Each structure stands twice: as C-alpha cells, then as structure tokens.
Amino acid sequence: MKKMPMRKRFGQHFLHDSFVLQKIVSAIHPQKTDTLVEIGPGRGALTDYLLTECDNLALVEIDGDLVAFLQKKYNQQKNITIYQNDALQFDFSSVKTDKPLRVVGNLPYNISTPLLFHLFSQIHCIEDMHFMLQKEVVRRITAEVGSHDYGRLSVMAQYFCDNTYLFTVSPQAFTPPPRVESAIIRLIPRHNFTPVAKNLDQLSHVVKEAFSYRRKTVGNALKKLINPSQWPLLEINPQLRPQELTVEDFVKISNILN
C-alpha cells in the first residue's frame, strides 16, 4: 500500500517501533467490550494492535489523505468507524456507545495542550485516556506543587484527572524522529474532587491569571480578582507564589468569586 507523506502542519510523527506499540497496548489493556477512540491514528500502526483487542473502535483523523488511506486499509473491518474531523472540534459524546469512552492516541505536539483542555470539557463521557505526548508536557501534567514544571496545565489536569507518567519513548521510535523525547501518560477522570469548583470557566480564568505572573506573589498576581480582606477567609497566604498553591487552593479562590 502506498505510503502517505507526513504533513508538518499537522505535527505528524508516525510511531513505528513494534516494542513500544505493544507496551502502549499493554498499558491501555483494552477489553473486547470497550469503546476506544483513537485520536490521530496516522497510518494505523497502533490501530492494528487495538483492532485485535476491541470490538468497537472509532478513529478521529483530520488529514483527508490519511482518512482515505485508512478507509481503504480497513474497508473489511466491521468494528471500526472513521471520523474525518478536527479533534479540537470533535464532539466525543457523539460516538455511539452505551459505555464511557476510552480515549487513546499519539497527540500532535502542536495542539496537545488545547486538545487536553477540549477533552476536559467533555470528561463526563470518558472512562480513561492514554496518550503519547511530548515528555515536557507529561512532566507538566504530573508536576508536584512547588516544582519548576507546576503551572496552569498541572492544576487543571489534576483537578479533572488522576495522572500517571508511565514511560518515556525515544525519538528513534518515530518517522520522522521528533527533536524531543516523548512519554506515555494515563489520565483517569476524577468524579469526586473536593472541593468542587462551582464554575469551571471561573477556575480556568483564575489559574490562567495567576500563572501569567508566576514570579509575583499570588496576592499581587490576583489583585484584580481578590481583595486583601478575602485572603484570611480563604486561609491562603497571599505572599505565596502561584506555583506554591495546591489545586484545592485554586478551587477555593475560584469559588469565593461566585
């Protein structure tokens, strides 16, 4: 079958290492009754492995040439549905299933963060997620409070999910090799986070505002939102830096604004 060209505008790096592919499938541990959604399947390297383990697989691919390639490759498969769609705009609840979705994929580096935020907005229909991401992004998602990597993505990802850094993947596992290392992460939605954010848009705004001034104290960084008299009510020291606040702290700040 004719090979498809890589398109830089889609951030395409195709995974080809069979050992890494098997390791990813083992981490996902798909079951026959699962409904899996693969974002950015490319030429179907991971798809081939998933098809043998799962009876209901949906592929979301933006590249029209790759969609045609995949339709031809899997035209005899009854357990696969291909959506030509931008994952950043895709309604994941539109996938026909009576079970929560298990979302997987080798996410394009150039859209990984906005795509994660899009998925968080649809977390109600997702059971878990396993992604290949730039290693730096995985470190930010799983960063601990007070660390250099802890920031906006850390707070929002940790509000919505329990996140586990699984393993690192070398650039040599891809064609063409990216300039940076990649890593596999598991994200499991949290449905009982305490305290609950009353307004998720407000929470996102507070976190974004705070980390726009991460070198300032949180009292100064959020002075447009929080007046000095409110900090004692929150039981948060306004002299702390934004990266020293926990997810719970940010939720409390957000909730006092509602």
From Swiss-Prot:
InterPro entries: KsgA/Erm, rRNA_Ade_diMease-like_C, rRNA_Ade_Mease_Trfase_CS, rRNA_Ade_methylase_Trfase_N, rRNA_adenine_dimethylase, SAM-dependent_MTases_sf. Signal peptide: none annotated. PANTHER family: DIMETHYLADENOSINE TRANSFERASE (PTHR11727), DIMETHYLADENOSINE TRANSFERASE-RELATED (PTHR11727:SF7). The gene is rsmA. Its EC number is 2.1.1.182. This is Ribosomal RNA small subunit methyltransferase A. It catalyses: adenosine(1518)/adenosine(1519) in 16S rRNA + 4 S-adenosyl-L-methionine = N(6)-dimethyladenosine(1518)/N(6)-dimethyladenosine(1519) in 16S rRNA + 4 S-adenosyl-L-homocysteine + 4 H(+). S-adenosyl-L-methionine binds at residues 13, 15, 40, 61, 86, 106. Transmembrane segments: none annotated. Keywords: Cytoplasm, Methyltransferase, RNA-binding, rRNA processing, S-adenosyl-L-methionine, Transferase. GO terms for molecular function: 16S rRNA (adenine(1518)-N(6)/adenine(1519)-N(6))-dimethyltransferase activity; RNA binding. The keyword Cytoplasm applies. Specifically dimethylates two adjacent adenosines (A1518 and A1519) in the loop of a conserved hairpin near the 3'-end of 16S rRNA in the 30S particle. May play a critical role in biogenesis of 30S subunits. GO terms for cellular component: cytosol. It comes from Coxiella burnetii (strain Dugway 5J108-111). It is an enzyme of class 2 (transferase). It is found in: Cytoplasm. Belongs to the class I-like SAM-binding methyltransferase superfamily. rRNA adenine N(6)-methyltransferase family. RsmA subfamily. SMART domains: rADc (SM00650). Coiled coil: none annotated.
